[in-house]
Amino acid sequence: MSDTLPLLLRAARGEAVERPPVWMMRQAGRYMKIYRDLRDKYPSFRERSENPDLSYEISMQPFNAFKPDGVILFSDILTPLPGMGIDFDIIESKGPQIGDPIRTMAQVDALHPLNPAESMPFVGEVLGRLRQSVGNEAAVLGFVGAPWTLAAYVVEGKSSKNYAVIKAMAFQEPALLHKLLDHFAESIAQYLRYQIDSGAQVVQMFDSWAGQLSPADYDTFAAPYQKKVVDLVKQTHPDTPFILYISGSAGVLERMATTGVDIISLDWTVDMAEALARLPEHIGVQGNVDPGLLFGTPEAIEARIDDCVRKARGRKHILNLGHGILPGTPEENGASFFRSGKSVMDRIGALA
């Protein structure tokens, strides 16, 4: 019977559920003391995310503490890069650093096709262990970065405020950028298939930096490659719910709905009711509480959750933040978010 399946999986498939499932982007991370203690012991981010024992332990920390309805693999969107021949590191307080930023056609031509089982066996191992550990108490989520966002990192060489280098490439050498984006789309689709085969029940694609594009450029450099990833994954795994997240997506919501995804993860800068009015009925939503609210009071967190769920009522909805939980968030407020999310129907009533 399907009601023995995890709540989040049932909701993501569009089944009627007793309450919206709840999880948090970046729910495993720096706001938790247990994570900071582990980070002090293992300071290398790549070790924490690529050692299967550490990645598994970190992925399980929020589940053990708060029992969210989703457990997401502890990893990074850049994790597949070395398997394509691109070296990177993540430096504490500085963020990602790309060893040799990609600026030429020769560099793109030299990239390897991704074989995830070969280059990232730790990912498959962790996903399998997570499925075994959480059973039907939570859905296991896999994730990837979208082609535009991966390209932004590897072309810029690091995080950027204005994306001048990749935008220069887009407007001066579009053929070069399109070839890179196409390579990433093929590779990311393979990576998602591997994650699903290894145990991921729901997947999310982060196009974090696509919100930096004008709608016309989104149509040219982001949406076609998002759609290619979705199409390739749906060819082999049509029943796996697919979520798309873009930070700063209010200007392209309708466009996101044309990519073939099942659920759009909203940031907090768009009102939930307005977003739903703009999206087709068959598209579900995830979000969209402001992570900054988690620096407030438990009462404020509860009130905002109630408002969000009330507005999303009647539509496929997964309760989440509008972005990852912020470092420095009081851990008890993270607990508050989960507690209030799970008890929301007690306050707003099943039919209110």
Swiss-Prot record:
The keyword Metal-binding does not apply. Substrate binds at R26, Q27, A28, G29, R30, D76, Y153, S208, H323. The record marks D76 as: Transition state stabilizer. Pfam families: URO-D (PF01208). Its EC number is 4.1.1.37. Pathway: Porphyrin-containing compound metabolism; protoporphyrin-IX biosynthesis; coproporphyrinogen-III from 5-aminolevulinate: step 4/4. It is an enzyme of class 4 (lyase). It is found in: Cytoplasm. One of its GO terms (cellular component) is cytoplasm. Keywords: Cytoplasm, Decarboxylase, Lyase, Porphyrin biosynthesis. Its main location: cytoplasm. Signal peptide: none annotated. GO terms for molecular function: uroporphyrinogen decarboxylase activity. GO terms for biological process: protoporphyrinogen IX biosynthetic process. It catalyses: uroporphyrinogen III + 4 H(+) = coproporphyrinogen III + 4 CO2. The keyword Cytoplasm applies. It comes from the Bacteria. Homodimer. Belongs to the uroporphyrinogen decarboxylase family. HAMAP family: URO_D. Catalyzes the decarboxylation of four acetate groups of uroporphyrinogen-III to yield coproporphyrinogen-III. This is Uroporphyrinogen decarboxylase. It comes from Synechococcus sp. (strain WH7803).
